[in-house]
Regions:
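Surface-exposed, charge/polar-rich loops and edge strands
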Residues: 1-324
Length: 324
């Protein structure tokens, strides 16, 4: 076997991961932890793709709590010349190094035995689909525990290198309320202050709101901030104390009145869509942290939909893992 190192650099910030195959059993026994629900229709789409290609063509984005020795091994390996080095059309630099020395591979395997858990950062649907394809193939013919379908393609990144961006919300209407009624209602749970210019939240439990060509700062009142790992997330606070009770958004996964915009597109995208009349109000979020993500996964809980937006995205097609 060989490993690869995969580095992505975006806007001067680099993240360096190890490309490996991870075991479907470690997902099933919760050593590889999730923080999101998946949808059956999206899973099926990816199951069909993996089955038809007989391969994983896009890696799952996994993370782990930093281990100094692993960092040191990888730092030494990237002193060598990469086998790939290119800039994609989205201006992300991608570099790949090959690790084919047995002693280095064995060292990494031994060090990862000390890592208690891996966490899915991005790719919950692809991860669930890879596992289901493996289980399906186990049921067909004689089971071979070394067969490639028992494993799926992943890149493992140390948590301190990852960058979660804000994942912002747009709502089509004010649920039958006038602007004044809406502003009155939200002041029950939030301190509302009109601000000059765009407002990007700079601390947890604060939100930017764009309505009728004006920006507001919303500060959640202490009385609505829950103490559990999921309830205290800003996405939960906004959902439970504003989107559901005031705007009537029940299930954000299925409600057609809400849309989500990754922070990579900036606040200008929110302004554009509200000013065009397509949407009525926008909410700019403070990003979820890696610590929050891992705490929720460790508690065996799930985050609300659209809680995290990771950049840069891992590129499909650089690495391919054939299942047979």
């Amino acid at each position: 076997p060989v490993f690869y190192i995969y580095s992505l650099t975006m806007n001067g910030r680099e993240q360096i991961g190890l490309v490996v195959c991870t075991s479907i059993d470690e997902y099933l026994n919760n050593t590889i932890k999730k923080h999101e629900f998946t949808r059956a229709d999206k899973e099926q789409d990816r199951i069909n793709h993996v089955d038809y290609c007989n391969a994983n063509t896009g890696p799952i984005f996994l993370t782990y709590k930093n281990q100094k020795t692993i960092d040191q091994i990888i730092s030494k390996e990237i002193e060598k010349a990469p086998i790939y080095d290119f800039i994609s059309e989205d201006k992300v630099e991608h570099k790949v190094w090959l690790i084919d020395e047995d002693n280095v591979i064995n060292d990494l395997v031994e060090q990862f035995k000390k890592v208690p858990s891996l966490y899915i950062a991005d790719g919950h649907h692809r991860n669930a689909s890879a596992v289901k394809v493996g289980l399906k193939r186990r049921g067909e013919g004689e089971y071979d525990k070394n067969a490639e379908f028992n494993y799926y393609l992943s890149v493992l990144f140390p948590a301190d290198q990852l960058h979660i961006m804000d994942y912002n919300r747009l709502v089509k209407d004010l649920n039958g309320l006038t602007k004044e009624e809406f502003l009155d209602k939200i002041q029950e749970n939030f301190t509302v202050t009109e601000v000059e210019g765009q407002y990007k939240p700079d601390a947890i439990h604060t939100f930017g709101m764009y309505l009728d060509k004006k920006w507001y700062k919303l500060q959640a009142k202490d009385s609505i901030i829950a103490t559990d790992s999921v309830g205290c997330l800003d996405v939960s606070i906004l959902q439970n104390s504003l989107l559901t009770p005031v705007l009537g958004i029940g299930d954000p996964r299925t409600d057609k009145r809400i849309d989500f915009v990754g922070g990579i597109r900036g606040l200008g995208e929110l302004v554009k869509r509200v000013d065009s009349g397509e949407m009525t109000v926008a909410f700019a979020m403070y990003p979820t942290s890696m610590t929050q993500l891992m705490n929720i996964a460790d508690d065996n809980k799930v985050m609300p939909p659209k809680s995290t937006w990771f950049e840069p995205k891992l590129r499909s097609g650089i690495f391919i893992h054939k299942l047979s």
